[in-house]
Regions:
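Alpha/beta-hydrolase active-site loop
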Residues: 81-101
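N-terminal cap/lid segment of alpha/beta-hydrolase-fold proteins
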Residues: 1-25
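Conserved alpha/beta-hydrolase "acid-adjacent" motif
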Residues: 281-287
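Short beta-strand/loop motif that positions the catalytic acidic residue
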Residues: 268, 274-276, 280
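Alpha/beta-hydrolase fold nucleophile elbow
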Residues: 92, 101-114
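Catalytic active-site module of serine/aspartate enzymes centered on a nucleophile-bearing elbow/loop
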Residues: 292, 298-337
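Alpha/beta-hydrolase-fold enzymes
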Residues: 100, 104, 117-249, 253
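Short, surface-exposed "cap/lid" segments of acyl-processing enzymes
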Residues: 19-75
Length: 337
């Protein structure tokens, strides 16, 4: 990230060191909006090499833009986290820090993937009373994945978990040891799509597609090159947790399938706007449909669902036409309050 950002450290409620990135913008006319990244990436995932990325468009629309590096960020020390830890410790502390620094009592949020699942747990448990609008991409409370991904979680994960504590798509650039080189060889032998080796490693790690997290037609060359440096370590502990959630069809506490986070009523008055890429092969769009149906039963007509026909998972944020197809919709929903 360049000098357009200030870095503000904060401690999660359990003492883990995280940070916020604050986009430097003269005299924002609207309140703070927090962007929350997914697993195995960092806040810079919202900052692709385009002047029309979501950060700049939010700032141009008058928002005070903040980005959270929670404990799953590759900018922070590797650690074996699960969604419960993030939900109960990281997001509440980040939102509290923003309200302290800005003086605003309300925050809006744009959240993605495991930043989204963990943030939604926080909201459901009433830990984010300051957050009034949540724009969630890809998955929220009800993870639904392709059948091959179910196979990988149930059959391959137990095997991989005996050898690795982390997987790391950056092995596509440099694999540090024999076992990581073996993984890279397997990926190169089974992924023939015209993506970078890191991009192929991403698809192997997170989904069931060639590629899984974006449509290649949605990316320009500059963005494809940039992606290679935006993925790194993700712990096996996360995959074990999400496997339990997928099995139950709803987010559940780590190691416990008897309770779940489909709280009724949810302990938040936030309006929730869901985005799902129809071509997503990491979390199927059905994930967001199920969460919307749950929200609609709880408060009919209050929440919103967008299914984006041309998009997958992360190209929602760094697709070459996202500034035309996606960001105006998100900003409009934030403006509605």
């Amino acid at each position: 990230m360049n000098t357009q950002f200030d870095t503000i450290p904060f401690e999660a409620l359990d003492g883990f060191s995280c940070n916020l990135k604050h986009f430097i913008s003269p005299n924002p006319t609207k309140g703070p909006v927090l962007l929350v990244h997914g697993a195995g990436v960092r806040s810079n995932i919202f900052n692709p090499p385009s002047q029309q990325n979501i950060i700049h468009m939010l700032a141009d629309a008058g928002y005070d833009v903040w980005l959270e590096n929670w404990r799953g960020s590759i900018d922070l020390a590797p650690n074996e986290w699960d969604l419960d830890q993030v939900a109960k410790n990281d997001h509440p502390a980040a939102v509290q820090k923003i309200t302290e620094l800005t003086g605003s009592q309300e925050v809006k949020a744009i959240i993605h993937c495991q930043g989204s699942t963990s943030f939604m747990i926080s909201a459901a448990l009433g830990l984010l009373p300051q957050v009034k609008v949540i724009v969630s991409n890809a998955v929220s409370l009800h993870p639904v994945i392709p059948k091959f991904s179910v196979f990988k979680l149930n059959v391959l994960l137990p095997i991989v978990g005996t050898v690795f504590n982390y997987l790391d798509p950056s092995w596509g650039i440099e694999a540090p040891d024999t076992k990581s080189k073996v993984i890279r060889k397997v990926v190169q032998a089974t992924h023939w799509e015209k993506d970078t080796t890191v991009g192929k490693m991403v698809s192997f790690t997170y989904g069931a597609g060639w590629p899984a997290l974006w449509e290649l037609d949605n990316l320009d060359k500059k963005t494809m090159d940039w992606i290679q440096y935006e993925f790194a370590h993700v712990p096996i502990s996360f995959f074990r947790h999400i496997r339990n959630c997928v099995k139950n069809g709803v987010l559940v506490p780590s190691g416990n399938g008897e309770t779940h986070y489909e709280v009724t009523p949810m302990q938040t008055d936030a309006r929730i706007v869901l985005f799902g890429g129809v071509k997503n092969k990491c979390f199927l769009a059905e994930s967001q449909v199920r969460t919307f149906n749950y929200l609609e039963k709880e408060k009919p007509g209050f929440h919103k669902l967008y299914l984006m026909e041309k998009y997958s998972h992360l190209d929602i944020f760094f697709g070459k036409n996202a500034h035309v197809d996606v960001f105006p919709l998100m900003i409009n929903e934030l403006d509605k309050g």
